Amino acid sequence: MKLLFRQRFFSWFDSYDIYDEDGNTVYVVKGQLSWGHCLKVFDTSGQELGTVKEKILTWLPKFELYEGSSYVGCISKELSFFKPRYDIDCCGWHVEGSFRLDCRGWQVDGSFLEWDYSMTGAAGEQVAVISKEIFHMTDTYVLDIVNPVNALRVLMFVLAIDAEKCSRSSN
């Protein structure tokens, strides 16, 4: 399953669609005005599926992930020089190195500029590949997800990293 989204400028208080490879809307992401970023993910019928919410009053950015009203985990920016690092505590997820994530056996490796990610399972099977198309006015991500069951969590992971990057570039 492939998902595509194009983030628009100033979209944190707006909404944008997440498309499948045929151009059909699969999810709708809506930004809400709040202290810190708050992004809600809806299906096409308007049912809320997930939330990415920035915690405020933290020294470094931290985002909590929810599926429906259930807390899934959080993604925290770590202090580092030259290469961004994150600590991911989500259903047993753990980060080793800059973009090494372990969640239920999943691992995520990413590039220096945070444009490309590869997610693999405990047995080495591929969970998803996330890439950023660079020749656009706004960020355009392609999420190639092997099992559609993982689509929401993969999407929320990308939304949280993108929100942190947006905060970093606006400072």
Cite the ranges covered by each PLM segment:
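Intrinsically disordered, low-complexity proline/glycine-rich segments
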Residues: 1-171
